[in-house]
């Protein structure tokens, strides 16, 4: 895998399952579990594009941690949430993984790999955060941003009204 250092972001977005939310909030960090990094997107626009190429592609094959061949299950929006996070530490543990492709690949594949690589960044270690907003997945997939800070009322914005 080709890792390159990435600039330190001021905020990131993380897709997770709703049933993990309480543990995440109690810990105050996103844990990497069996992987080297935990993965994030730098904008909601990138998150949507990432999801369209991955979790929203039911049955599509991918390689999981350790090189195991897996297939995306049916995505259940009501069981997922996007977290908007402000990282606590400003250290440079951020990396981008550049999608590997065979030598002499067609230009279309090279371009697709480069575009996919720009959609996500990884953080080496468990990411501690200080602020969190929750973005409703079902609304997000309809093109709306329903966002709630902890202990604040929901705010709704249409995606075309936001600067992503």
Protein language model regions, located:
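Short, charged/polar surface micro-motifs in flexible loops or helix N-caps
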Residues: 18, 44-47, 88-91
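ADP-ribose/NAD+-binding catalytic cleft of ART/PARP-like enzymes
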Residues: 1-39, 52-55
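A generic structural motif
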Residues: 36-42, 112-115
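Active-site and NAD+-binding cores of ADP-ribose-processing enzymes
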Residues: 58-164
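Short helix/loop capping segments that flank catalytic or ligand/cofactor-binding pockets
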Residues: 23, 48-50, 93-94
